[in-house]
Amino acid sequence: MTDCIFDKIINKEIPAHIVYEDDVVLAFLDISQVTPGHTLVVPKKHVANIFEYDADLASAVFARIPKIARAVQASNPDIKGLNILSNNGELAYQSVFHSHIHLIP
């Protein structure tokens, strides 16, 4: 059993407000909500950070970002812009060591 909170969310061991899911990623609302709609996009394959991605995983994960961003925007007509952010490594302030991309309206 893993102690990774994102693995537990992916495996439906703990609840989350899911925005999007397919065979490659799970996107869900960040529990801290920097702004309304703050969403995390998490690869289902456990990789600690961007340095562990291979080309196929990177292509598959990042190809889904626009679709998920449009869904976040469609959920709230007040959203006029969106930041895409990923902290990679402890020195970059990564706090959960399962790669994830923040979509912050």
Residue ranges: model-predicted function:
Residues 1-105:
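HIT superfamily nucleotide-processing domains
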